[in-house]
């Protein structure tokens, strides 16, 4: 017998009364950055899930590689979070020991963008 499923978005609305849409998406993105896969079994880009060990293999001086990574990350985020209409992902700082990203997202029914600065540190994205 099949059990009916309730969309995750419904749970989001029921559990987060009083939390702004910006804060809700920020929390979801932080969970995404610190997980190995998203619901539905889709895997995330290796750099997002493995962080610095994977980063050491990337030529941080090559703008094409950094642009490729930003495109891959942008696509993964847009597949994961349907409330984002537009998203810009850019590398703020890239060295062999550091990686800092800047995300700017326009959410549905919101006039101000969500801006998120995120950095990989001590095995986690913060």
Curated annotation (Swiss-Prot):
Where does it primarily localize?
Answer: cytoplasm
- The parts of the chain that form a coiled coil are none
- Per the UniProt entry, what are the Gene Ontology biological process annotations, in alphabetical order? cellular response to oxidative stress; DNA damage response
A cellular-component GO term for this protein: cytoplasm
Query: What's an example of a GO molecular-function annotation for this chain?
Result: anti-sigma factor antagonist activity
UniProtKB keywords? Cytoplasm, Stress response
Its domain of life reads: Bacteria
* Localisation per UniProt entry: Cytoplasm
Q: Which family does it belong to?
A: Belongs to the GpW/Gp25 family. IraD subfamily.
Q: What does this protein do?
A: Inhibits RpoS proteolysis by regulating RssB activity, thereby increasing the stability of the sigma stress factor RpoS during oxidative stress. Its effect on RpoS stability is due to its interaction with RssB, which probably blocks the interaction of RssB with RpoS, and the consequent delivery of the RssB-RpoS complex to the ClpXP protein degradation pathway.
Question: What does the subunit comment say?
Answer: Interacts with RssB.
Q: What is this protein called?
A: Anti-adapter protein IraD
- Please report the organism this UniProt entry assigns to the protein: Salmonella choleraesuis (strain SC-B67)
